[in-house]
Swiss-Prot record:
CC per GO annotation: extracellular region; host cell postsynaptic membrane
Keywords: Acetylcholine receptor inhibiting toxin, Amidation, Disulfide bond, Neurotoxin, Postsynaptic neurotoxin, Secreted, Toxin
PTM comment, free text: Amidation at Cys-17 plays a critical role, since a C-terminally carboxylated analog is 3-fold less potent at the alpha-7/CHRNA7 nAChR subtype and 3-fold more potent at the alpha-3-beta-2/CHRNA3-CHRNB2 subtype.
Job description of the protein: Alpha-conotoxins act on postsynaptic membranes, they bind to the nicotinic acetylcholine receptors (nAChR) and thus inhibit them. This globular toxin inhibits human alpha-7/CHRNA7 (IC(50)=0.3-10.1 nM), rat alpha-3-beta-2/CHRNA3-CHRNB2 (IC(50)=10.3 nM) and rat alpha-3-alpha-5-beta-2/CHRNA3-CHRNB5-CHRNB2 (IC(50)=31.2 nM).
GO terms for MF: acetylcholine receptor inhibitor activity; toxin activity
Tissue specificity comment: Expressed by the venom duct.
Main location class: secreted
The protein's name in its UniProt record: Alpha-conotoxin LsIA
PTM-bearing positions, type Cysteine amide: C17
Domain comment (free text): The cysteine framework is I (CC-C-C). Alpha4/7 pattern.
Disulfide bond sites: C3-C9, C4-C17
Note: Negative results: shows a weak inhibition of alpha-3-beta-4/CHRNA3-CHRNB4 nAChR and does not inhibit alpha-9-alpha-10/CHRNA9-CHRNA10, alpha-4-beta-2/CHRNA4-CHRNB2 and alpha-4-beta-4/CHRNA4-CHRNB4 nAChR.
Ser-Xaa-Pro motif, crucial for potent interaction with nAChR: annotated segments: 5-7
Amino acid sequence: SGCCSNPACRVNNPNIC
């Protein structure tokens, strides 16, 4: 769950994943 499992969020926040 969270940003890292959300593709749209993940591409905008690569540093936290």
